[in-house]
Amino acid sequence: MSEILTKSRARNVFYGGSLFFIAVFVGLTVQSHNYVVSTTPALTDEVILGKHVWERNSCINCHTLHGEGAYFAPEVGNVMTRWGVLDDPDAAAEMLGGWMDAQPSGVEGRRQMPHFELTDEEKRGLSEFLRWADQMNTQSWPPNDAG
């Protein structure tokens, strides 16, 4: 009869198992937090401004950022690498500003980006936000580098 699971044994199994998995959860949470903090570039005021520009203009309604968002326009999580300006903040701001100023291009039958009335400071902030996003260690996600 000692093989029967009594109420007290069942309670002990439940509490013991619960405590074990809570400890595992807390440990994995701490490990994940430490990993993200150590591999993500630091936020600057320009990056924060760029994130606000990104959100205020609802860029995610057309673009994806690391696979999140709409698939109407190109992925922009790696756009600075594709343009070859990841390591040059001035060239990145100039490239993005020139692209945005040229929109919409007026080419018939092609998806068009609306013209946003952004200041030079906002364009610089947006380029810094996209450079920051491009420098994140996404562990090769999304798998499509073409954008």
Swiss-Prot record:
Cellular component annotations (GO), alphabetically ordered: plasma membrane
Keywords, alphabetical: Cell membrane, Electron transport, Heme, Iron, Membrane, Metal-binding, Respiratory chain, Signal-anchor, Transmembrane, Transmembrane helix, Transport
Localization, UniProt: Cell membrane
InterPro entries membership: Cyt_c-like_dom, Cyt_c-like_dom_sf
Any one GO MF annotation of this record: heme binding
The UniProt record lists the keyword Transmembrane helix: yes
Top-level taxon of the source organism: Bacteria
Membrane-related topology note: Single-pass membrane protein
Transmembrane feature ranges: 13-29
Short name of any one Pfam family annotated for the protein: Cytochrom_C
PROSITE patterns to which the protein is assigned, alphabetical: CYTC
Binding site for heme c: C59, C62, H63
SUPFAM superfamilies noted in UniProt: Cytochrome c
UniProt subunit comment: Heterodimer of cytochromes b (large subunit) and c (small subunit).
Protein purpose: Component of the anaerobic respiratory chain that transforms nitrate to dinitrogen (denitrification).
Protein name, entry field: Nitric oxide reductase subunit C
Organism, as annotated: Cereibacter sphaeroides (strain ATCC 17025 / ATH 2.4.3)
